[in-house]
Regions:
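Short loop/turn segments immediately following the C-termini of beta-strands
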Residues: 61, 69-71, 147, 157, ...
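A short helix->beta-strand "capping" segment at the edge of beta-propeller domains
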Residues: 24-49
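Beta-rich, blade/repeat-based domains predominating
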Residues: 47-59, 95-98, 118-138, 170-191, ...
């Protein structure tokens, strides 16, 4: 761990632009450069570092929401922020603090919902999985999934818990239960879809007021050549302007596309492990691949357009991007479950705009023509 700290210091002294001017070298971070020392240590957490970081959502450049699965004690000699392989999965010394917090553009914590840490401090739980806001909701409710609790939570913007779906630690496949839900996305009228999930193999559709409407999907476990609507690890969901529902069928290495009522339309294969899918405002589907550790861009016919990313624990490298988000200044944020951290990338000077991860929908900034 000490050698990592020394190496990181050396690397961070060398500007990316300087590396690009030399002969040889590599393009590790695509059109971005990593922002060092982001986020900053949380006051009062000396001796601890991030747990596994499940989700990140950029509301604005100065309000970036992060959810993590508790905090872990630092090994002797390590500094805050050091990545810990597989961190946050119930390790010895884990404490449930600052599971939901907000940082500004410099990585300083500006808000923490410590009143809700107790939600996740349950035996058998492992902490929040992803965090989002409904882009069509002017009240900007905050939605958080906890897969091991089998629950979905809806909070007011100020932090009041107003609605819960699912029963704590009870798995089910009916209209009142989940089987480790993973993600959520919305139609303009507030109708929403939940990817469900690690143990269930379905997408669940709810009305704007949260009533169960329908679900679709069957298990493909044990099948060598699974067909349409058969799934294994339904890990993410995104809805396009065309109202199509794009579903990460992770273990089957593909994206399946349905209409809003569950009719199968298409599938894109040979995407190794699609962890998270994001529909950009300009109508491209971006995917974080948890096996190749790359950020991938596809047009809506499924054509591969571009990809970048390098595996590893050093700043700028990736390991298990469970969720990513882009702010209004085109900064990219990633939440890594296996490196146990969130990272911020800013566009390089002169970066090709077509290679920058597209901005997602958010309130006040919807689809572009």
């Amino acid at each position: 761990m000490r050698s990592w700290t020394v190496l990181l210091g050396v690397l961070l002294l060398v500007p990316t632009s300087a590396l690009m001017q030399e002969k040889g070298g590599e393009d590790e971070f695509g059109p971005y450069e990593v922002v060092s020392d982001w986020p900053q240590p949380i006051p009062g957490t000396e001796g601890y570092t991030w747990g596994s970081t499940g989700g990140v959502f950029a509301e604005t450049p100065d309000r970036v929401w992060i959810v993590q699965r508790g905090m872990l004690p630092l090994p002797a000699g390590a500094k805050f922020g050091a990545p810990l392989q597989g961190s946050g999965t119930g390790g010895q010394g884990q404490k449930w603090q600052h599971c939901i917090f907000v940082v500004d553009r410099n990585g300083r914590m500006v808000q923490s919902w410590t009143q809700h840490d107790k939600i996740f401090a349950v035996k058998g739980a492992r902490g929040p999985h992803k965090i989002k806001m409904n882009p069509y909701d002017p009240q900007k409710h905050v939605w958080i999934m906890d897969d091991n609790l089998h629950q979905l939570f809806k909070f007011t913007y100020e932090g009041k818990l107003v609605q819960t779906w699912g029963e704590q630690l009870v798995r089910g496949e009916d209209d009142r239960h989940f089987g480790r839900p993973t993600d959520i996305d919305w139609l303009p009228d507030g109708t929403f879809f939940v990817s469900d999930g690690y143990t269930n193999t379905r997408v669940v559709k709810f009305s704007p007021d949260g009533k169960y409407l329908t679900s679709w999907g069957t298990s493909s476990e044990g099948k060598a050549n699974p067909g349409p609507n058969e799934m294994h690890t339904v890990h993410s969901v995104a809805v396009g302007r065309d109202r199509k529902v794009y579903v990460s069928d992770r273990t089957n290495s593909r994206i399946q596309i349905f209409d809003e009522n569950g009719k199968f339309l298409d599938m894109w294969t040979n995407i190794r492990r699609p962890y998270h899918v994001l529909m950009s405002r300009d109508q491209f589907l971006w995917v974080s691949d948890g096996e190749t550790h790359k950020m991938l861009k596809y047009d809506l016919t499924g054509k591969f357009m571009y990809g970048w990313g390098t595996f590893g624990p050093l700043p700028g490298r990736l390991n298990g991007v469970n969720q990513f988000s882009v702010d209004q200044e085109n900064n990219l944020y990633v939440a890594e479950v296996f490196n146990g951290r969130a990272q911020k990338f800013r566009p390089r000077k002169g970066a090709d705009p077509a290679k920058l991860t597209g901005q997602e929908l958010r309130h006040g900034a919807l689809w572009t023509p």
